[in-house]
Amino acid sequence: MILYSKRAQSAGSRANMLFFFLLAMVLTAIISGCAGKNFSILRPGIEVRGHYIDGVPFYQQKNSLCGPAAIASVLGFWGRTASLDQITAAVYLPELRGTLPMDMEHFMREAGFDTITSAGTLEELKVRIRTGLPVICLLDLGFGPYRQPHYVTVIGFDDANAVIIAHDGLKANSVIGYNTFENEWTRAGHWMLTANPRSSKDMQ
């Protein structure tokens, strides 16, 4: 009876976890609002409603290599080239299955960039986008006690539709609702990285 009771409790715990996971997915879909829209629908007239940075290349991430993919997008925007394999060898930590923010910044500095990292706000993020600087943001896609860090390259926003546009390593020009973005960004400490070639005079 004791063994049966423990098994029943374990099954109940798994059922509860599954319920809350599915509930979180449903709530995320609801609060995403306009995030279901395709970017091609939002693109016309976006400069009136926000801003979009053209010319930021998209790199498809492999496995958990969202950090290297985000770096490659920023490098490509500034006309610099580095393969995902080269970037991965420099910043990816297999034992963590990910990349640390400090290593992202160090790589960009070694590549000849001035960098700014901070715990920003949505308004500060939009200011940087308006100046034409793509911004790497760290999100946490997990829920509850479960963490799932994920880097995205933010390249636009649309105030009228309350969405962020970002290359997320899986999809180019992914549309993310402000509420969803804020929640995931908050869980990761609002970390963001802006990089500008060291020779440029435009860094704010």
Tell what function each PLM region has.
Residues 2-32:
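Sec-dependent bacterial lipoprotein signal peptides
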Residues 73, 106, 126-127:
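Surface-exposed charge patches
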Residues 27, 31-97, 122, 141, ...:
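Active-site-adjacent structural segments surrounding the nucleophilic cysteine of cysteine proteases
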Residues 88-123:
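Mid-chain, structured segments of secreted extracytoplasmic proteins
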Residues 35-40, 158-204:
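Noncatalytic regulatory segments and standalone regulatory/sensor domains
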Residues 109, 129, 186:
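Anion (oxyanion) recognition and catalysis
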Residues 114, 118-168, 175:
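Active-site-adjacent substructure of cysteine-protease-like catalytic cores
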